[in-house]
UniProtKB/Swiss-Prot annotation:
SUPFAM superfamilies cross-referenced by the UniProt entry: ABC transporter transmembrane region, P-loop containing nucleoside triphosphate hydrolases
Protein name: ABC transporter C family member 8
Span of domain ABC transporter: 594-818, 1344-1578
Main location: membrane
Organism lineage string: Eukaryota, Amoebozoa, Evosea, Eumycetozoa, Dictyostelia
UniProt KW keywords: ATP-binding, Coiled coil, Membrane, Nucleotide-binding, Repeat, Transmembrane, Transmembrane helix, Transport
Family per similarity comment: Belongs to the ABC transporter superfamily. ABCC family. Conjugate transporter (TC 3.A.1.208) subfamily.
Gene: abcC8
InterPro entries: AAA+_ATPase (IPR003593), ABC1_TM_dom (IPR011527), ABC1_TM_sf (IPR036640), ABC_transporter-like_ATP-bd (IPR003439), ABC_transporter-like_CS (IPR017871), ABC_transporter_C-like (IPR050173), P-loop_NTPase (IPR027417), TMD0_ABC (IPR056227)
GO cellular component: membrane
Pfam families referenced in this protein's UniProt entry, alphabetically: ABC_membrane (PF00664), ABC_tran (PF00005), TMD0_ABC (PF24357)
Subcellular locations according to the entry: Membrane
Membrane topology value: Multi-pass membrane protein
Bilayer-spanning residue ranges: 27-47, 75-95, 100-120, 135-155, 169-189, 280-300, 318-338, 392-412, 419-439, 505-525, 1005-1025, 1064-1084, 1157-1177, 1251-1271, 1280-1300
Boundaries of every ABC transmembrane type-1 domain copy: 280-561, 1010-1308
Organism: Dictyostelium discoideum
């Protein structure tokens, strides 16, 4: 007896058409056991090795009663089922003895026992029910149904097998138990883990969704309902589950990537596959089954048409009804499987993006940006390249799925059309090498395209970072040309790629036409008759082939693009990290904080910047590092925080490090949070730090106090305020070692001394017991430090304390002598002191005068009295023609102070205000923290001199914050009512995308071209319909000649006439003509769309960039750079690559749907009755979905901007972040922002699946109705007509689905146009040019007249300049001073028209500047800003972007800027490249280059905003001399932090709260002891004297 007993092993029983009993029991019934063996063992291994969770069944609260009861039911049913299966086994063994029957019974008992074991373990470990068990129960139920059917037929006597009642009853009871388990698995599901990490209101419904809900995406209904009722907000979107969160995904990827890094050739794709592959591979199972179900329709079509042709009643109507039912069930199951596949793939794509973005972010924090990767490139890696991965994932399986579908199609076609199918196969084989060649061409250009995208993004980023300088220099046009030049190159390459892709797509999309034409031609020419049962199933298969054929080139193209992105990402991730061991963190020698031993360090390989450095710093020591510009001071700092590569020696620090960079790094956060820097608040410590850093007065006048939001890069703080916040952050950090990289250069002299005393000094400084390293150019601090390190050419040339170095002479003496030389140069016209001046100054208070005299005697030869120096310098100059004029031009008796009637109360109030805030720049005050009981000797003297100050300078600070240099001009989405906030919240449009947005795209393409494109799509569909309609006529013309049985084809009989043959050729020729017309129309539509999309992309980018660069400064002050970059990267990418493709697919499907409706209505009007309600439901579902999808897309776009903003902010402060060892916090914030963005994307893609399933369900209903109609009307309809109806019904299902989805995708994509259009319509500054012309020599004199000038930054804020009236005569040198919010910067902005006047005018050489275009105004003046900005490009480009000057003039300017040697030493000289932001130059060298710009410009009006703050004393002396000589015939306005800088000015302008308080020569102002200028000079001198007293004591 064999395995099957007496029967042979066969699959089918020939008599009944059912499975044979042996095959059913031994194969079909064991399939669930095989599934359980594969997946159950995996789950068993996991459970055995997992520790129990914190909660078990007994620990669950009342909230989990559903889970508890379901679990109890499942356990009880599983036990009963195992017991019953054992009983069933006994029954089977007692009745049967065949091996396959015994095997079946044993396998059944074992598999259910294993299932029970898994259920028990999951309960014991506190785990949610696994998908492996749930799917097993559902699978087992369906398989058990097959067995039950067999037994039911047998017991009913309709089978050849005999079944007893006992066997049937025992099986039926087991079947009912399986049914219970499958129902619980489908309807009940609680994910216990979700309750551990999330609040109840944050939990996504998906977490606890049952199987039915997951299959149909019912769980997303709650979000869609909310979105239908109102515009969704970010808070309405559920939080990502733990499996989707960036932190977990990053850990998985890092683990896989670390394994790859151990290999000789690390592979990023393999790392991603290792981390996320399993989930992706499981999706392939769904795809395989779905691919097989695709062919149910064509197979059934042949049977349906055969049924229609069998009018003789040989086939029962019941068979036709079964066909109609199958036409409904197969697409529904296919849809459920397809969208589970898509959902998994999209989810994996989202995971890949999270992992890649996080990896790039972390890598940027670990590598040096001097390695050659620009910020623009890194932004593209995060936006464009990561997006390529995400876009590819859903279609990557088509690489094997498409060939599989094509192979099955060809096999089925062969069965229908015999060997003629090989003609079509030959066409396809010919296309493969052609498309491979095309793909290679596309790949090469894709690499170039990505590089150009990087260059463009980098250029735009540079423009945004340097926009203020660009506007001040009127360089907008130059940078527009520069960016547009790169963009045009990018578009040229993109155009080539699109034409290549268009040609490839044309070949593939037309291949079904080629295949059908060639196949039918060969079929007819071989003498065959084409019947309806052959033609329409064949056409249906050709339609099936169309999708994989269309998708294959797109997927190949996407793979090519992704491979380019992989290479770029892999190259970046493989960049060398900064060596974490370059700085050792342990020093064996006790009492040593820093030790550098014989170290040579470099920024770039083989280009050392520091040579043989030997440096030892003791704990608690205060060390100053000095030297000329480019000597290596900042490089020493960089070496201590690990930014430099070490080629030899050792660098070691013992303890934590806090860094204050030379250029202050400020976060977009509140002032308080900037200081705390995520440290826990200690109020007393915080207050003392704020006081020590002289920030208290600033906090008092900020609109929100220390809760005021600081804009991006500290936009609403002055340079001094930013630097003091930076110092406060470091001090609060409580580190062991503090490194100050010349931060005091940004503050005025007396505030710098106050900070030095309060923070750094060995006597009273908060950090007196800490190790302090101070890089400085201010030599007056050097006597008070423990040790001085002198750098020159990257080497330490001298070292010691102040006195030792002075006695030793050499380099240090030379450095100190420069200060004296500078003073002597300024004193050449007045070598002697003025006794008159001394008497005048001394007339204030006798006691204080005596003290000052004693101090001056002690300091004689070391420190000159600043008041005397100012008087001497001012007296030495010729008196200005207007020196005795009033501000308005009228004579007044008391110099230039505006007198008003005052009361004693006002005087007292003024004294209190001045005690708190005597300031001459953006917030620099002289208040110092005093110990309890300490006398305020610091402020006593100046206060006594200021008792009679006028009331006009001491008005109370208003609540609007106008006393602070906030510049929130009204801009897009600004919220002026919130005065604590500077950065506007990015909002989104709500509701349906306006038709104007679509119209703007068509206008960008060109109305005529857009009309032609639409016409070509209509023509293509019309010709396609005519071809199919002709097939229907063709097949109907043969009447009953077709073989209705569907056995294949019939040959022409011997009686066939030549006429019949000619008739077939006639029909074939017309069909070929229509097909050729379709090909031609497709060609025209494809290439016209490419041409139009390129034209539209170019126009949108140009308009947006022009609108952005011409926007007022207020826009940039309130808009983060990351938000703007988002428009230029992701949104522009959507217009470049997505919209045209999506629009084309929508137009195509729309034409197909309309065409199908026309054909169906024409052939069978009755089906319209079914189409009306189905169409209505289509519309309702689409509208219901679109309300939410549209808002989710907008939210996804809005939430993407903070990622880029955070990234840009991080890169700007990466050195500080690394020094503070705070990398982990910033990584966590990046992950949080990424998750906020991804949750919108995830819900959006899930809603897409929700939509598709419902639309395809309606489509299945429509097809079923069409088949039902043909079945019921077979007596009145021809087979060819029926084939046409069903073919178009099948087509309209998919097409209507795709049309709705493409319309939704199109609207979602058009959101990018909406966002770009928003920027295209930004309000602009005044035009660069207008009708008003001025001579080329204007301004020839440089006379400036302010007439009643009022200025406000935006409507609703108080004016920042109030009635300024004064005249600056030609060639006058004016020093501008004032305290916080005085209006100094506002005056400069008004002069350059960065802000337009509220009222009043400014005239230059008699011309009202508001009548001029901005270009002639700004380009005829020169400004040297405090923050030097350089752009990537050559040195020549940075000095002369318009190529206006020859090499001789440029070299002369460089020489006068004292940078000649540094530039000549560069490879390439003037053509040497400047890195992003000038990173390959020191800050001082950057400042000198900026001075070179002004020298090259040769303007008659020069504005200096602390032009030499970052320059050493020696260079400063030379620069000051250059300014005096080269700008001698110019009008010069100098905003001063150091009073010495303006001591020799012709006039001093004192501003306070927007009012001009004093305007006269320094000598005249110093004669009046009540003048503010006198008090400032005296205060500075007093502070210096007190410091000297403290030192001597």
């Amino acid at each position: 007896m064999g395995f099957c007993g007496d029967e042979p092993f066969t699959v089918w029983h020939n008599d009944s058409g059912d499975f044979s009993k042996c095959f059913e029991d031994s194969v079909v019934m064991t399939l669930p056991a095989i599934y359980l063996l594969i997946f159950g063992m995996k789950r068993l291994y996991y459970l055995e090795n997992k520790k129990p969770d914190l909660f078990t069944l007994k620990q669950l609260s009342q909230d989990f009663q559903t889970w508890r009861k379901t679990l109890q039911l499942e356990v009880i049913v599983s036990i009963l089922l195992v017991a019953w299966k054992i009983l069933f086994f006994i029954v089977i063994v007692s009745i049967y003895n065949k091996p396959f029957e015994i095997l079946y019974s044993v396998v059944t008992v074992v598999q259910w026992t294993v299932s029970l074991g898994l259920v028990y373990l999951e309960m014991k470990k506190g785990q949610s029910r696994s998908w492996e068990i749930r799917l097993y129960w559902v699978f087992a139920f369906f398989v058990a149904t097959v067995k039950l059917r067999t037994l039911t037929l047998a017991i009913a006597g309709k089978s050849i097998y005999n079944v007893g009642f006992l066997e049937y009853f025992s099986y039926f009871v087991g079947y009912c138990l399986i049914l219970i388990l499958s129902i619980t698995s489908v309807l009940f599901f609680d994910n216990l883990e979700s309750y551990q990490n999330l609040e109840e209101n944050e939990i996504s419904k998906e977490v606890n969704a049952n199987l039915f809900s997951r299959l149909t995406f019912w769980w997303i209904n709650s979000v869609l309902v909310k979105g239908h009722k109102k515009a969704l907000e970010i808070s309405d979107v559920p939080t990502l589950g733990e499996i989707d969160q960036s932190i977990l995904l990053s850990e998985k990827f890092e683990k896989a990537w670390e394994e790859q890094l151990k290999k000789p050739n690390p592979s990023l794709p393999w790392a991603l596959a290792k981390a996320f592959g399993p989930h992706f591979y499981i999706a392939a199972l769904f795809k395989i089954i779905q691919d097989l179900l695709i062919f149910v329709g064509p197979t059934l079509l042949k049977r349906v048409l055969g049924f229609v042709e069998s009018r003789d009643g040989s086939q029962d109507t019941y068979d036709g009804l079964i066909y109609a039912l199958l036409y409904f069930l197969a697409p529904v199951v296919q849809s459920l499987l397809l969208h589970q596949y898509f959902h998994r793939c999209y989810r994996v794509g989202m995971w890949l993006r999270s992992a890649v973005v996080t990896a790039v972010y972390k890598k940027a924090l670990k590598t040096s940006l001097r390695e050659g990767t620009t910020i623009g490139e890194i932004v593209n890696l995060m936006s464009v390249d990561a997006q390529k991965f995400m876009d590819l994932c859903p279609y990557l399986h088509m690489i094997w799925s498409a060939p599989l579908q094509l192979a099955i199609s060809l096999v089925l076609l062969y069965r229908i059309l015999n060997a003629s199918v090989f003609a079509g196969l030959g066409i396809m084989l010919v296309m493969i090498p052609i498309n491979l060649a095309i793909s290679n061409l596309a790949k090469k250009r894709q690499t170039i395209s990505m590089k150009l995208k990087d260059r463009r993004t980098k250029a735009v980023n540079e423009v945004l970072n340097g926009i203020k300088v660009i506007k001040l220099y009127s360089w907008e046009q130059s940078f527009m040309d520069h960016v547009n030049e790169i963009r045009n190159k990018e578009l040229d390459v993109m155009k080539a790629i699109k034409y290549i892709q268009g040609f490839s797509l044309l070949l593939w999309s037309m291949s079904p036409v080629f295949v059908s034409v060639s196949t039918f031609t060969v079929y007819i020419l071989t003498g065959q008759v084409l019947s309806a049962t052959q033609a329409f199933p064949a056409l249906s298969l050709f339609n099936v082939m169309q999708f994989p054929i269309n998708m294959l080139p797109s997927v190949v193209s996407s793979i090519i693009e992704a491979s380019v992105s992989v290479a770029r990402l892999q190259k970046f991730l493989l960049k060398k990290d900064l060596d974490p061991n370059v700085v050792e963190h342990h020093i064996n020698e006790p009492g040593i904080a820093v030790k550098i031993d014989n170290a040579t360090l470099e920024w770039e390989p083989n280009k050392p910047i520091l040579h043989d450095i030997n440096l030892t710093i003791k704990k608690g020591e205060l060390v100053a590092i000095v030297g000329q510009v480019g000597s290596g001071k900042s490089s020493i700092v960089s070496s201590l925080v690990g930014d430099l590569d070490k080629t030899k020696g050792t660098v070691a620090v013992n303890g934590s490090v806090a860094l204050v960079s030379q250029q202050a790094w400020i976060q977009n956060a509140t002032l308080k949070n900037n200081i705390l820097f995520a440290k826990e608040l200690n109020q007393d410590k915080y207050q003392s730090v704020v006081q020590a850093c002289c920030l208290e007065p600033d906090i008092k006048i900020l609109p929100g106090g220390d809760q005021t939001e600081i804009g991006e890069k500290g936009i609403n703080l002055s340079g001094g305020q930013k630097q003091r916040v930076s110092i406060a952050r470091a001090v609060y950090n409580n580190a062991d070692i503090y490194i100050f990289d010349d931060p005091l250069s940004a503050v005025d002299a007396h505030v710098g001394k106050a900070i030095f005393k309060n923070v750094l000094s060995n006597q009273d400084g908060i950090l007196c017991n800490k190790t302090r390293i101070l890089v400085t150019h201010a030599v007056h601090y050097l006597p008070y430090v423990d040790r001085i390190i002198l750098m020159k050419d990257g080497r330490i040339v001298e070292e010691g304390d102040f006195n030792t170095l002075i006695e030793a002479g050499s380099h240090f003496t030379e450095l100190m002598s420069h200060d004296e030389q500078q003073q002597q140069l300024q004193q050449q016209q007045a070598p002697d002191k003025s006794s008159d001046s001394n008497e005048q100054i001394g007339g204030g208070d006798n006691k204080e005068s005596e003290n000052n005299e004693e101090q001056n005697e002690e300091e004689e030869g070391e420190n000159e009295n600043l008041l005397e120096k100012v008087l001497r310098k001012s007296r030495s100059r010729s008196p200005s023609p207007s020196s005795n004029r009033n501000i308005d031009g009228d004579d007044i008796a008391s110099g230039s102070i505006l007198q008003t009637t005052r009361t004693p109360e006002e005087d007292e109030q003024d004294e209190r205000e001045l005690m708190e805030d005597i300031d001459i720049d953006g917030g620099e005050n002289i208040q110092t923290p005093l110990q309890k009981g300490e006398k305020s000797s610091v402020l006593k003297q100046p206060l006594r001199l200021l008792k009679k100050l006028p009331t006009s300078i001491n008005k109370k600070l208003n609540n609007s914050g106008s006393g602070v240099s906030l510049k929130p001009i009204t801009t897009v989405n600004a919220k002026p009512q919130d005065k604590n906030k500077i950065i506007s919240v990015e909002t989104k449009q709500e509701g349906k995308v306006s038709f104007k947005i679509y119209l703007s795209y068509f206008k960008a393409i060109g109305v005529l071209l857009a009309t032609c494109i639409i016409g070509f799509y209509v023509l293509t569909q019309l010709l396609s319909i005519l071809a199919n309609w002709w097939i229907s006529i063709w097949t109907n013309s043969y009447g009953g000649n077709g073989n209705g049985s569907g056995s294949g084809s019939i040959s022409l009989s011997s009686s066939s006439t030549v006429e019949d043959n000619e008739k077939a050729k006639y029909y074939l020729s017309i069909y070929v003509a229509f097909s050729c017309g379709t090909i031609a129309a497709t060609f025209l539509r494809s290439f016209s769309m490419v041409f139009g999309s390129i034209k539209g992309s170019k126009l949108f980018h140009e308009k947006m960039f022009k609108a952005v660069i011409l926007s007022p400064m207020s826009f940039f002050d309130t808009t983060p750079i990351g938000r703007i970059l988002n428009r230029f990267s992701k949104d522009q990418l959507t217009i470049d690559e997505s919209i045209a493709r999506t629009l084309g697919m929508f137009l195509n499907t729309f034409c197909q749907v309309v065409g199908s409706i026309i054909v169906i209505a024409w052939v069978s009007p009755f089906i319209i009755l079914a189409m009306v309600p189905v169409g209505a439901l289509f519309y309702f579902i689409q509208k219901y979905y679109l309300n939410s999808s549209r808002e989710l897309t907008r939210l996804e776009g809005v939430s993407r901007s903070p990622i880029y903003a955070h990234f840009s902010e991080t890169l700007a402060g990466v050195t500080t972040i690394r020094a503070f060892k705070d990398v982990a916090r910033f990584v966590t914030e990046n992950e949080r922002l990424l998750d906020e963005n991804q949750k919108c994307y995830y819900i959006n893609i899930s809603s897409n699946r929700w939509l598709a399933i419902r639309l395809e369900f309606l489509g299945a209903c429509l097809v079923s109705c069409a088949v039902l109609y043909t079945v019921l009307a077979r007596s009145r309809i021809e087979a060819g007509t029926a084939g046409l109806v069903i073919t178009y019904a099948l087509a309209i299902t998919g097409n209507m689905n795709w049309m709705v989805r493409m319309s939704c995708d199109l609207e979602n994509s058009v959101v990018s146009i909406e966002r770009i259009q928003e920027y295209c319509l930004l309000p602009s500054e005044a035009p660069l040019f207008n009708d008003k012309s001025v001579p080329m020599s204007w301004p020839s004199h440089g006379k400036i007249v302010f007439k009643n000038l009022w200025l406000t930054y935006r409507e609703g804020l108080d004016p920042v300049l109030r009635g300024i009236n004064c005249t600056i005569e030609p060639k006058t040198k004016v020093g501008i001073v004032g305290r916080t919010g005085a209006g100094k910067s506002s005056l400069t902005q008004a002069l350059f028209r960065l802000v337009e006047p509220l009222r009043g005018t400014i005239e230059i050489d008699g011309i009202d500047i508001t009548e001029l275009g901005l270009n002639p105004l700004r380009s005829r003046m020169a400004i040297i800003p405090q923050d030097p900005v350089l752009f990537a490009g050559s040195v020549r480009y940075n000095l002369d972007p318009f190529d206006q000057y020859d090499d001789h003039e440029i070299w002369e300017a460089i020489e006068n800027a004292h940078l000649l040697k540094a530039i000549k030493d560069l490879d390439g000289g003037l053509d040497a490249m400047v890195q992003d932001g000038g990173d390959n130059f020191s800050v001082g060298q950057r400042q000198l280059l900026v001075i070179g710009r002004a020298l090259l410009k040769k303007a008659n009006i020069i504005v200096l905003d602390e032009a030499s703050s970052s320059i050493d004393i020696a260079s400063d002396a030379l620069i000051q001399e250059t300014i005096r000589t080269k700008f001698a015939d110019c009008t010069v306005l100098t905003i001063a932090h150091r009073l010495g800088t303006i001591a020799d000015s012709d006039k001093i302008m004192v501003l306070d709260k927007g009012e001009l308080i004093e305007y006269d020569s320094p000598s005249e102002l110093l004669k009046n002891q009540d003048s503010i200028y006198y008090s400032l000079v005296k205060a500075s001198e007093s502070k210096q004297n007190i410091d000297n007293d403290d030192e001597s004591n």
